[in-house]
Amino acid sequence: MELLPLPDVAERTGRDIMAVRQLIKDGRVLAARRPDDDILCILDEQLDEAGEPVKHLPAVITLLRDAKYTDEEALRWLTTPDDSLPGTPLQALRENRGTEVKRRAQAAGF
């Protein structure tokens, strides 16, 4: 997992920086600030090989936000290992196991 500054995301995905910011604004990916330099970044695992948000990620983000998770908490939830998956929810999404992850995200709100 690598935190990529927005200009690096733009370069990797062939988007301009405003389009990358729109992905964040639209809730299609989550962004976080690196603690060492406060630069806004996107975790690379949120994007598939084509540079698009991983399938089902926007729906999971919506579910977590509805459960009152902050974006930082949601990112932590997505990257914390879950023995019942196994692996992290983000890894499960990358393996096209979105239904399982969405169920867990719904349960996280209760």
Language-model features, listed with the residues they occupy:
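Non-transmembrane "mature" sequence context
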Residues: M1-F110
